[in-house]
């Protein structure tokens, strides 16, 4: 019964994380229309493209959307990070639970 609860908890936390990631991605896509922030926020685009300044929206990396979202919408970004940590914790507990149950079965045989 505990294993089913952990699987449901893991599934729900993954869905919450994916939803919050989509929200952050959407909020960060505002970077394309905000030319002023290109040089201050699009750090990964500069690094990946090997350029000094971003001059076109096509040069902006998708990862920079998350940076822009964290800069302008920190609450949603913090919730996404917390939900990711919860996914990791739930996954760890599920793996630990399965491992402990297999050891108990193995010792009884």
Curated annotation (Swiss-Prot):
Protein name (database record): Uncharacterized protein YjdJ
Leader sequence segment: 1-25
Cell location: Membrane
Pfam families in UniProt: DUF4306
InterPro entries: DUF4306, UCP007103
Organism: Bacillus subtilis (strain 168)
Keyword set, alphabetical order: Membrane, Signal, Transmembrane, Transmembrane helix
GO annotation, cellular component aspect: membrane
Lineage: Bacteria, Bacillati, Bacillota, Bacilli, Bacillales
Main location (coarse class): membrane
Keyword Membrane (UniProt): yes
Sequence intervals crossing the membrane: 73-95
Bilayer topology: Single-pass membrane protein
């Amino acid at each position: 019964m505990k294993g089913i609860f952990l699987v449901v908890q893991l599934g729900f936390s993954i869905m919450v994380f994916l939803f919050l990631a989509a929200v952050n991605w959407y909020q960060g896509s505002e970077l394309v229309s905000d030319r002023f922030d290109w040089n201050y926020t699009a750090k990964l685009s500069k690094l990946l493209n090997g350029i000094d300044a971003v001059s076109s929206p096509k040069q902006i990396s998708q990862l920079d959307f998350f940076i822009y979202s964290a800069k302008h919408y920190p609450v949603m970004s913090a919730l996404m990070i917390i939900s990711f940590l919860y996914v990791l914790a739930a996954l760890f507990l599920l793996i630990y639970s399965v491992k402990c149950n297999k050891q108990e079965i193995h010792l009884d045989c």
